[in-house]
Amino acid sequence: MIALPLERRLSPMAHWRAFQALVTLFRTEKPDLVHAHMPISGFLARMAAWWAGVPRIAYTCHGFWFNYTGNLPRQAIGYLMEFLAGRVTGVFLTVSDEEARDARRLWISRHAVSVRNGRDPAVFHPDAAARTRIRSALGVPEDCVVVVVVSRLVRHKGYPELAVAMRDVPDAELWVVGERLESDRGGDMDALLRAAGLGDRLRLLGYRTDVAAILAAADIFVLPSHFEGLPMSVIEAMLTGLPVVATDIRGPREQVVPGATGLLVPAGQSRSLAEALRRLTGNPTLRAAMGAAGRMRALDMYDETKVVARTLDLLGL
């Protein structure tokens, strides 16, 4: 592993330094293939690989930047970056079908293909022993309905709406798993959640290495994001047999079959979110049916082994 000076935020000078470092690296190492990810780092890596004469360049899009910002100049910059880098990209992959269609429709890449995301079913699965162990450690009785969210603690994951919605879901606890990255910006979601007035029904669990066990101990998974690629956390929850309540946005709406494996709600609307959560908290039979259907869907579509094999095949490896 080689660390390079990459910045997630827009910073022309920082990006120029990163580009130079990448060109130097590629000219030194002479790779046969460069496979890039994410909007800014993916743009820089592909352009640097082209400049350095790397024979094969691939890219996996985890969500187009221009689809996620309402700022018109940023949308234009995001599209221009993808369009330019698309000219030098031999293999163009996306994690969602919708993004692949966007890439083809917007002339970013005529050959864009969705490979999806995947997780390991041997790690994420229903686990009665883990459920008992985690609930015992947290002092949560078996009959308590637990809603869990696993994500970075940032505003665009929908925490403001979730905090308000949970006030109207009195018969359930909310477990929040995750933390902020140093590079994350925006308000303090810990403070926002604590101020929601949920009292003992809120558990901020922070960063955990036992996410599979935490999911197995929960009853409902929620992810009210404003934008996503194809969230791994939803796949993990589905493999664990949890019904999923998510927002009707790119990514989750490909994963969740409304009424069959979970429920979709409009982004940014706490009332709809509360209604969906109440529908599930009050109906254990529905939770079990949706969870089982979601697990079957995840095993078919999001098994890590299948996703990796498809990716390697498309990369010619």
Regions found by a protein language model. Name each.
Residues 207, 226:
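Aromatic "clamp/platform" in nucleotide-sugar-dependent glycosyltransferases that forms part
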